[in-house]
Amino acid sequence: MNQMLVPQLITVNDYTLAVPALGSAGRYARIVARAEACIARIDQIIDQGFTCSSATSFGKDSTVVLVLMLEAIRRRVEAGLYMPAAFVTNAQTGTENPAMETYAEAMITELEAYCTRLGLPITVVKVQPSMTSTFAYATLGRGKLPVFAGASRSCSVDWKLRPQQKALKQLLSTLQSPGELVTFVGTRLSESATRAANMRERGEEEAGRLVLNEHGSYNCSIIADWEMEEVWEFLMACEAKRGGPYRTFVDSFDWCLELYKEANEGTCAIITGDGGNKAACGSRFGCAWCTVTGERDKSMEAMIASAPEKHGHMLGINRFRNHLINTRWDMGRRDWIGRTTSDAGYINVTGTAYNAEMRRELLRYLLTLDVLEEERAEEHDARMFRGELERTESNEILRGSTFQFITPKNLLAIDFAWSLSYGFDHAFPALSEWYEIRVLGKRYLIDDVTPTEKGIIPEQRWFKFDDWQSPAQEMGLQDAYLEATNKHRYPERPAMRTIRDRFEGKERNIVYYEEADEMEIDPADAMCLVDSFDEAFYTLAKSLSPTDSAKFYLNKGLVKLAKGKAAEYDAMARRAQFWQRMERDLAGTDLRSYIRHHSISNAEHEQILESMKVEPAMQNLAISDLFA
């Protein structure tokens, strides 16, 4: 707190607290009163024995909450009061808006230095979503559709909320007698009608109230009743140059304000001077290609239009996002070969995922965007070195690549998923795409696609396996050669592993694999493999079956499977092999058309399932009649 403010005693939440005299806060008196009430509530929560955490994206709202928690903790430390360990979490999804990601990384560096300098017992935790929930694996690898407007935002839960809760749970387990966890969040009622309704449904409409969440810890919307203008006013109150009464982990939030201004076509600003026009900026930042926002991502478009010299390199990302939107209802990009097998021996025929062609197209686009960004950065750095560009702050930020969406780790995850999917012709299919773009110089620019109008999605149908045998007859992840050679190559470990067959329920030997709590790929191992993927590797891959690369990853321990999930991946491999064999046997007939033509309706399938329930009952009745 700025020393020029004379403390006074006020009562907040039934107890007395020394705070800056509001009269001496001048034009900030109103926001100081609001902030001090929040700080007092946080202090009270700490006094009650709770462990505190702030979940921040470094957007305007979560930054306010972070600063309030930091201020409460700083005062306790300076006063010599007991202060248990606290945490700040930041979710790094790998799909963030590059401008916001660059800003967040800079803020984390400043925050960690601030906590160290002041001796605050705060740990900054950077979390990532589980491998199987990432856009790279789930959408590019497995074909899961992105979350579009009108659907529940499962991406926010999978990519941000769940990883943060998991990380905090692990950290709390290392502490001696930790208190129950309270996470301070920046949700506000005035953000939107939908947000307000959701907050009321969860019981978060009262600022400072502790609300038990589904993870067994508490959420606290400490600024639930703040208006957007108050959010900006508080951030401005943290700057000495504006005469603000607070000091925090950065000297000013000008960078933050500038981002929001640019995301609102360069016209949005807040002026805190006397008589100034206080038009606060309320733009929102989503992921780089957030599809929840509807037909357009107005924030990113505005950033590119208002400051092309700073954000023009994100134009390709916006085109990628629009491509996802424009092809949403294109059923020709869907995979009509399902993944659910019924008790009657049928597999579902439903277009709820992208087909192999669409997944390959999307990967090509992102790989190309990554390469183009590297080329932009190299040219930018060269011009800086030659003195052709001024060494401004914005030019310094643009040095080096500002994004890489397809990292080696992501590439291996996609390659592993494709190796277990129908529609890919040879081993290491994703790595081959990488090689052709990175080494052979291919480029795939995103064309404008006429949006497909929303239509009626065909209902789910069912195709019977029996006519073409069954995936149960396929080899899947079995490999006699690896089983034989592993005994000599790796005598210290089992030559193979045993699982419970998903189709027949019997024990079954498959390739050796390692397990972890969830699917795991070591980034360093991934980088080494990608670097070694040369012309000979590329050529060899063309002569191997897709499943061979999956078995390679598992046998080498490059991909570790989630505990107890190996049988699922074996079943995936066998289904893919079954469809590949069926396609060969059809000798040119389109597989998807054949399956749909020879499938039955959902109603017919339900009748078959019902008859299966009746038959055992009739048999039992007949047996009982024999002994009547």
Residue ranges of predicted features:
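Nucleotide-activated chemistry modules centered on ATP-dependent adenylation/adenylyltransferase
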Residues: 2-55, 60-628
